[in-house]
């Protein structure tokens, strides 16, 4: 029996490599022309996030923070796009902050695609990009205590007092929900520790796979819907 297996393995090694390339090519091309149509099932974690956002009342104020850059864009950006699309579909007001410098560029890209091109929304009335501020977790603490002291202008240089949707928004408790699109520090953990947990504002996050082990304890404590 073992001898037959060894002979089979050796015979495979003698196959003309061109046949191997043909098989690989067919394996790639056939599904493109004849899609298998396999169902896409949401995981329990994904469903929790969806339900948490879906349960928000229309015109709820949602703070979305961008904490990733080009290196993690392939992993995080689709989540950011998805959450923005879901929020705007449900007529929520979106306030965008950035704990990373690159996060502002990611946010501008996502808002241009979804808010402007897909939904045709009005800046300052339906969404606003407050932008990046240096300071890591100190920025989160500033938003918790006095957002207007930290953000006197938005990313476009417009005075916050002149932005219609900023009326009656002064601190993190004025928001109905927080979403962190995070690739690391500062990010999800800081939002939980300094904002969501102390104030009770519900929160969710989209993180890189490498952060899951760090974030899951907060999920188990129901501090994050992930």
Task: Identify the residue ranges that each predicted region occupies.
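A substrate-binding/cap region within the structured catalytic cores of diverse enzymes
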Residues: 106-175, 182
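Cytosolic juxtamembrane amphipathic/interface segments immediately preceding
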Residues: 3-12
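Membrane-embedded segments
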Residues: 71-122
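Alpha-helical transmembrane signal-anchor/signal-peptide segments
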Residues: 38-55
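Hydrophobic alpha-helical transmembrane signal-anchor segments
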Residues: 11-35
């Amino acid at each position: 029996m073992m001898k037959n297996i060894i002979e089979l393995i050796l015979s495979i090694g003698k196959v003309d490599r061109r046949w191997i390339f043909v098989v690989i090519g067919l394996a790639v091309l056939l599904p493109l022309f004849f899609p298998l149509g396999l169902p896409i099932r949401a995981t329990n974690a994904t469903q929790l996030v969806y339900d948490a956002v879906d349960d928000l009342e229309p015109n709820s104020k949602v703070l979305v923070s961008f904490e990733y850059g080009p290196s993690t864009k392939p992993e995080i950006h689709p989540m950011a796009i998805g959450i923005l699309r879901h929020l705007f579909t449900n007529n929520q007001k979106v306030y965008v902050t950035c704990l990373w410098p690159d996060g502002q560029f990611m946010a501008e890209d996502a808002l241009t695609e979804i808010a402007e091109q897909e939904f045709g929304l009005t800046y300052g009335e339906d969404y606003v990009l407050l932008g990046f501020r240096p300071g890591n977790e100190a920025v989160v603490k500033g938003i918790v205590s006095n957002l207007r002291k930290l953000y006197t202008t938005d990313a476009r240089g417009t005075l916050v007092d002149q932005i219609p949707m900023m009326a009656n928004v002064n601190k993190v408790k004025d928001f109905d929900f927080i979403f962190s699109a995070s690739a690391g520090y500062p990010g999800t953990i800081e939002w939980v520790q300094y904002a969501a947990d102390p104030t009770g504002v519900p929160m969710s996050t989209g993180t890189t796979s490498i952060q899951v082990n760090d974030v899951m304890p907060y999920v188990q404590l129901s501090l994050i819907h992930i």
